[in-house]
């Protein structure tokens, strides 16, 4: 079930179970995981794959392994808030994932997170190739951190 309102998403979550976040791109997906208390977001890994069936199978494995209770997907919208082609691609992916899992899926505005993640890694002297391999997972953790911080206020 896809949910666009955090106030509706939060009550559906099982206590003491982590969330997973996805930064969905055309060539790779960044994955982040919260701790069970849902107060820390950590980059987990990057899936470099364009076949959606393989991507969903990989995500199902991660969801099962970590006993995840909900999914956050970064929703790319342009700076004015308008829907873009990439927004529609991510929405379609979210719909496909929703058919495969019985967990709530929350769509979180992800404007500028990949750029911020890349700048963050650059500030630590991470080389360009390594930044490009890890920026999506770091972006996913930033998306998840935004959600975790917002949930604390509910």
Curated annotation (Swiss-Prot):
<keyword id="KW-0690">Ribosome biogenesis</keyword>
<comment type="function">
    <text>Could be a nuclease involved in processing of the 5'-end of pre-16S rRNA.</text>
</comment>
<dbReference type="InterPro" id="IPR037027">
    <property type="entry name" value="YqgF/RNaseH-like_dom_sf"/>
</dbReference>
<keyword id="KW-0963">Cytoplasm</keyword>
<keyword id="KW-0378">Hydrolase</keyword>
<dbReference type="InterPro" id="IPR005227">
    <property type="entry name" value="YqgF"/>
</dbReference>
<dbReference type="GO" id="GO:0004518">
    <property type="term" value="F:nuclease activity"/>
</dbReference>
<dbReference type="GO" id="GO:0000967">
    <property type="term" value="P:rRNA 5'-end processing"/>
</dbReference>
<dbReference type="InterPro" id="IPR006641">
    <property type="entry name" value="YqgF/RNaseH-like_dom"/>
</dbReference>
<protein>
    <recommendedName>
        <fullName>Putative pre-16S rRNA nuclease</fullName>
        <ecNumber>3.1.-.-</ecNumber>
    </recommendedName>
</protein>
<dbReference type="Pfam" id="PF03652">
    <property type="entry name" value="RuvX"/>
</dbReference>
<keyword id="KW-0540">Nuclease</keyword>
<comment type="similarity">
    <text>Belongs to the YqgF nuclease family.</text>
</comment>
<dbReference type="InterPro" id="IPR012337">
    <property type="entry name" value="RNaseH-like_sf"/>
</dbReference>
<dbReference type="GO" id="GO:0005829">
    <property type="term" value="C:cytosol"/>
</dbReference>
